[in-house]
Amino acid sequence: MLSVGDFARSKVFYDKLLRFLGFKLKHEYGNMAGWSNGETLFWIAAADAHGRKRKYRKGDIGFHHYAFELASRGAVDQLGRFLEDNGMTVIDPPGEYYGRNYYAVYFADPDGMKLEAMIWAPPKPKRAAKSKHKRS
């Protein structure tokens, strides 16, 4: 569960984002909401009064960032356009990071929490060359 500073604002943000990613709002209890894509749940909840006094800072105890794994580079590109079209903060545009096999877009939620959508295709192992000589 992710604690958020302004539940109403964050719910609008995450509802748009998660619906785009194929999730549906399944649960809502007061200041908590949960979405599902049939495989996993993603929850947000209002931070308590003490927590709302502090701003998210990457490097503090807690999440560094949260990543969603997508099915293809095209899906990452589509999300990048969706983020821009909806005025969401893009930190790093769709591109290759950490090498050619890692393709991602980085963006921020209303509290500045860093989010990522990525596809990682590990390199395929090289197959041994076929011998031109017949075995007897």
Could you describe each region identified by the protein language model?
Residues 50-56:
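Short beta-strand/turn micro-motifs at beta-sheet edges
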